[in-house]
A protein has these predicted regions:
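Conserved glycine-rich Rossmann-like NAD(P)H-binding loop of the short-chain dehydrogenase/reductase
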Residues: 37-52
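Conserved glycine-rich cofactor-binding loop
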Residues: 21-22
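Residue(s) in the substrate-gating loop at a strand-loop-helix junction
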Residues: 151
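C-terminal helical subdomain
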Residues: 191, 207-242
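Active-site loop immediately N-terminal to the catalytic Tyr-X3-Lys motif
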Residues: 109, 158-162, 203
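Substrate-binding pocket helix/loop in short-chain dehydrogenase/reductase
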Residues: 107-120
Length: 264
């Protein structure tokens, strides 16, 4: 049973992707553009966004560019709201996807509050800012889709993840509540929980990353999930299903299993 309206026709739709200069965000924007969507790409790195636009030319029937760079810093209050107003002046937003994120390995023995708060600002509070920017528009239209990229790191506590993991767990809880409250309003909500994807963030890992996939592969998994109307889109399943299974264990078994599974 589909939990969301199936998103399988992107022709003429406008999708705003925040955190689209690299990785999953950029690959998803590229894949959506190929399917006929008008993509608005946002991130801090303006040159990377401009480069994306250069290799994704095209005009809509109304003469609007099919790829637009809208640089911003998600950690600045009001930045996403101002950007949303800029987009809405030219039309509507059909889907908003929050891909922005930061990640730094950190153990509890190396607790660093500034690092913790930076993760909160970018990974979680930025998502709240995006929702604040687009949700009133979606409620008026009685349509739209909110997509949040979390991680399997949000399923349960993992070593070296004290800054990153809690922000991803918060996104999972947030997405569940959004779905419960917005489904009756015909607003879709999807939660994306990747395993290891070869991105600039994961390149800093000094441990083996099982079932590592490319950003392009991740984008295709996301598109398939949207087309099926899934709420949670997790991949690659040969890895994520194991993580889900371990999380079902009682804590007396979970903690040793995680230590053995991660080797950390």
């Amino acid at each position: 049973m589909s939990l969301n309206p199936k998103q399988d026709n992107w022709q003429g739709k406008t999708v705003w992707l925040i955190g689209a200069s690299t990785g999953i965000g950029r690959s998803t924007a590229s894949a959506l553009h190929a399917l006929g969507a008008r993509v608005i790409v946002s991130a801090r790195h303006a040159k990377a966004l401009d480069d994306f636009v250069l290799v994704h030319p095209g005009k809509t029937a109304n003469g609007l560019p099919t790829a637009v760079a809208l640089p911003l810093d998600v950690s600045l209050d009001g930045a996403l709201q101002a950007a949303a107003q800029t987009i809405l002046k030219a039309g509507s937003i059909d889907c908003a996807m929050y891909c922005a994120g930061t990640y730094k390995e950190q153990r509890a023995t190396e607790f660093n509050l500034p690092t913790m708060l930076e993760h909160q600002r970018i990974n979680y509070l930025g998502a709240l800012q995006m929702i604040d920017a687009v949700l009133p528009h979606f409620l008026v239209r009685q349509s739209g889709h909110i997509s949040l990229i979390s991680s399997v790191a949000g399923y349960g506590g993992l070593p070296k993840s004290i800054a990153y993991g809690p922000t991803k767990a918060a996104l999972i809880n947030l997405a569940e509540i959004l779905y419960l409250d917005l489904h009756s309003k015909n607003i879709g909500v999807s939660l994306i929980c990747p395993g290891f994807v070869d991105t600039p963030l994961t390149s800093q890992n000094k441990f083996n990353m099982p079932a590592l996939i490319t950003p392009d592969e991740a984008a295709q998994e996301i598109l398939k999930g949207w087309a099926k109307g899934e709420f949670e889109i997790h991949f690659p399943k040969r890895f994520t299903l194991w993580v889900k299974a371990i999380k079902m264990l009682p804590y007396r078994l979970y903690f040793p299993a995680i230590k053995k599974f991660t080797g950390l």
